[in-house]
Amino acid sequence: WYENSIQNDDVNQNLVKEFLLECRKEYKETGNKKIIEMYSEVRSFINASNYCLSPNRIMSLVGKYSNTSYSIAEILEWYENVNLLSEENYLCPVCGKLLDNDILKEFRCTDMCMYYRDKESLLPKKFNVDNSGSKYKKLKRGIYTYTLLPGVSELRIYDQLAGCYGYEKVLLYPEIDKFDISVIFDTGVIYIDVKDFASPHDLVETLIKNQSFIKMESVRDNDYVYLVIPEHRQNTYKGGNYRNIVKKRILQLTNKVRVVSEDELHKEVGDIVNELY
């Protein structure tokens, strides 16, 4: 059972990768900038508010871009039917997942979710089912695990930066996911990748395996590249200073990438902005 579940998770996550590749291919062939807009909106749609939802919400997004790309229909495969046996359900306030209301589990969720719930004293959210016989969908587990959960930190950092510098200058998943976030100014661009790995060693090895440094070093000389360690990883890792472990290893591989914690990122971006202006 376990092996089959893991295989299904991998298959589900590949659905997102296939969508990414289709969007890149279509954009390369057509140059239609609506595809870039579509990809960013679809990726940001996979968030805590849309873990469990009505099919109408999904169809609304599909309809918005149905004349832009045939690949938009693929997101229908990212969700599966869910049977809500109770009219009153509870969702995790961090990731949006349906919580088991077994009193012994105390509505617990992932370690990341519990970190932010404890820090901010967040309580589970009530999710009431209407009596109209409406059906609901939930995100498939592989997409929840490999896209929604890492996206929690990406979206949080994006919203914070956009709140400071404006949504017209701060882009989410720019250039069809070349990076997670970019901050654009007259004389340069700050590119940001947020990496949410349990182990700093696994993070670096994955970057090497995926040849991510080629992408990071391909930016212009007056651009900046930041690799950001989410707050919960930096503060809960027990094997040493997470950021320093990654930083030391990456310095052996490239001098283009700056490794910072989430807290440090905002000062770094602010310093660069002040220099540019």
Predicted regions and their residues:
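Acidic-basic catalytic patches of nuclease active cores, encompassing PD-(D/E)XK
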Residues: 85, 125-173
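Beta-rich nucleic-acid/ligand-interaction surfaces
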Residues: 73, 172-184
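Non-catalytic C-terminal interaction segments of nucleic acid-processing enzymes
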Residues: 47-51, 63-84, 243-277
